[in-house]
């Protein structure tokens, strides 16, 4: 992937939850957004008030959980991703 994230931004590929096996079809606006994803790219981090870099704690390949309405959806190379701040991520699988 040729996409460099800036600052403390994280590019996430949403992992679909298997709750859509129901015969009842819901409109897109009523469906629950995924809250689990795989980290595809990370920025270098953010700077504190002294100008020191605070490095990211996440790395490419990490599986994370994030707030349901966090980030912005983007499309790159015909694939949909979510861009969010590292602080919007609430947990990482270990």
Swiss-Prot record:
<dbReference type="InterPro" id="IPR020818">
    <property type="entry name" value="Chaperonin_GroES"/>
</dbReference>
<dbReference type="GO" id="GO:0005737">
    <property type="term" value="C:cytoplasm"/>
</dbReference>
<dbReference type="GO" id="GO:0051087">
    <property type="term" value="F:protein-folding chaperone binding"/>
</dbReference>
<keyword id="KW-0143">Chaperone</keyword>
<comment type="function">
    <text>Together with the chaperonin GroEL, plays an essential role in assisting protein folding. The GroEL-GroES system forms a nano-cage that allows encapsulation of the non-native substrate proteins and provides a physical environment optimized to promote and accelerate protein folding. GroES binds to the apical surface of the GroEL ring, thereby capping the opening of the GroEL channel.</text>
</comment>
<protein>
    <recommendedName>
        <fullName>Co-chaperonin GroES</fullName>
    </recommendedName>
</protein>
<comment type="subunit">
    <text>Heptamer of 7 subunits arranged in a ring. Interacts with the chaperonin GroEL.</text>
</comment>
<dbReference type="InterPro" id="IPR037124">
    <property type="entry name" value="Chaperonin_GroES_sf"/>
</dbReference>
<dbReference type="GO" id="GO:0005524">
    <property type="term" value="F:ATP binding"/>
</dbReference>
<dbReference type="GO" id="GO:0051082">
    <property type="term" value="F:unfolded protein binding"/>
</dbReference>
<dbReference type="GO" id="GO:0046872">
    <property type="term" value="F:metal ion binding"/>
</dbReference>
<dbReference type="GO" id="GO:0044183">
    <property type="term" value="F:protein folding chaperone"/>
</dbReference>
<keyword id="KW-0963">Cytoplasm</keyword>
<dbReference type="Pfam" id="PF00166">
    <property type="entry name" value="Cpn10"/>
</dbReference>
<comment type="similarity">
    <text>Belongs to the GroES chaperonin family.</text>
</comment>
<dbReference type="GO" id="GO:0051085">
    <property type="term" value="P:chaperone cofactor-dependent protein refolding"/>
</dbReference>
<dbReference type="InterPro" id="IPR011032">
    <property type="entry name" value="GroES-like_sf"/>
</dbReference>
């Amino acid at each position: 992937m040729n996409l460099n994230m800036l600052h403390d931004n994280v590019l996430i590929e949403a992992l679909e939850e298997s709750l859509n096996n129901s015969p009842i079809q819901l409109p897109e606006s009523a469906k629950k957004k995924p809250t689990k994803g795989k980290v595809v790219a990370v920025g270098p981090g953010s700077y504190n008030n002294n100008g020191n870099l605070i490095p990211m704690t996440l790395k490419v390949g990490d599986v994370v959980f994030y707030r349901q309405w966090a980030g912005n959806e983007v499309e790159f190379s015909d694939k949909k991703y979510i861009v969010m701040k590292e602080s919007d991520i609430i947990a990482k699988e270990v």
